[in-house]
Amino acid sequence: MASPARVKRSLPDLTHPELTSSGAPLVMVTAYDYPGARHAEAAGVDLILVGDSLGNVVLGYDSTAPVTLADMIHHGKAVRRGAPNTFLVVDLPFGTYHAGVTDAMRHAVRVIQETGADAVKMEGSTPEVLDVVRVLSRNGVPVMGHVGLMPQTAAAQGGLRVQGKDDDSARRTLEGAVALQEAGAFAVVLEAIPARLARLISERLSVATIGIGAGVHCDGQVLVYHDLLGLYEGEEKKIAKRYADLGREAREAIAHYAAEVRAREFPSKDNSFVMKDEVLDKLY
């Protein structure tokens, strides 16, 4: 018997009061392609984020800065095809919402129209970003905010380092999250900040907080697909947890395949097709 179709989370489902009453934090994971999206939806996550982290983990860049709007749309389309019934958020990449509200609106609408996403995400809480959040939200484009460590502008923050550990940084992070809520953001990502600060922010906001490296008291958590599955071997990141070791398994599987090819063990008879002798004889 076929299982019933999954019911996609709606925007009202993602509000803070409903989360606290249910007691179950939201689960978000990144995905960048069709198979990854299928895995995430089949696992029953609440939200999928097509993050501009694809620049690092998929495209091989050193940062997210080179990622373009075309990149995000291309990958967003693939993810939506793989996860038609999961709430989908797509990052607006660096430079697409910094030149004014008109440009930002045009880019956000393109993302929604061309990918089928349910919302967009943007980093920061400067007055310019808040203006964009305000206009998009008022015009029917749901926006997820992002404070704390912001990879798009990490160089200006002193690199990829924990934020909110001193008085000024903690206050900026708290005030930025509150300002994003007031501008209309339906949720705010808290990245790489002390757990106690994240708890305070979560208590202050009436919209959901989604943590990554921000402790257990956020209203939800997000991890990068490649970090979660251990697709890259090496030291485990502090803000992530490795639930599998697929990088090692992939390397070993490819090495096994290569060894069998070189030993003429693959393809075997089980992987080959046959033909009748009389058909072959006519070719000589």
Swiss-Prot record:
Xref: CDD domains: KPHMT-like
Reaction catalysed by this enzyme: 3-methyl-2-oxobutanoate + (6R)-5,10-methylene-5,6,7,8-tetrahydrofolate + H2O = 2-dehydropantoate + (6S)-5,6,7,8-tetrahydrofolate
GO biological process, one term: pantothenate biosynthetic process
Main location: cytoplasm
Details of cofactor binding: Binds 1 Mg(2+) ion per subunit.
Intracellular or extracellular location(s): Cytoplasm
Residue positions binding 3-methyl-2-oxobutanoate: D52, S53, D91, K121
InterPro entries named in the record: Pantoate_hydroxy_MeTrfase (IPR003700), Pyrv/PenolPyrv_kinase-like_dom (IPR015813), Pyrv_kinase-like_dom_sf (IPR040442)
Enzyme class of the recorded protein, top EC level: transferase
EC id: 2.1.2.11
Positions that bind Mg(2+): D52, D91, E123
Active-site residues, Swiss-Prot/TrEMBL: E191
Membrane-crossing segments per the record: none
A matching Pfam family: Pantoate_transf
GO molecular function: 3-methyl-2-oxobutanoate hydroxymethyltransferase activity; magnesium ion binding
Top-level taxon of origin: Bacteria
Functional pathway: Cofactor biosynthesis; (R)-pantothenate biosynthesis; (R)-pantoate from 3-methyl-2-oxobutanoate: step 1/2
Sorted UniProt keywords: Cytoplasm, Magnesium, Metal-binding, Pantothenate biosynthesis, Transferase
Cofactor(s) the protein requires to work: Mg(2+)
GO CC terms, sorted: cytoplasm
Family as reported in the entry's similarity comment: Belongs to the PanB family.
Role of this protein: Catalyzes the reversible reaction in which hydroxymethyl group from 5,10-methylenetetrahydrofolate is transferred onto alpha-ketoisovalerate to form ketopantoate.
Subunit-level organization: Homodecamer; pentamer of dimers.
Name assigned to this protein: 3-methyl-2-oxobutanoate hydroxymethyltransferase
Species whose genome carries this gene: Deinococcus radiodurans (strain ATCC 13939 / DSM 20539 / JCM 16871 / CCUG 27074 / LMG 4051 / NBRC 15346 / NCIMB 9279 / VKM B-1422 / R1)
Lineage of producing organism: Bacteria, Thermotogati, Deinococcota, Deinococci, Deinococcales
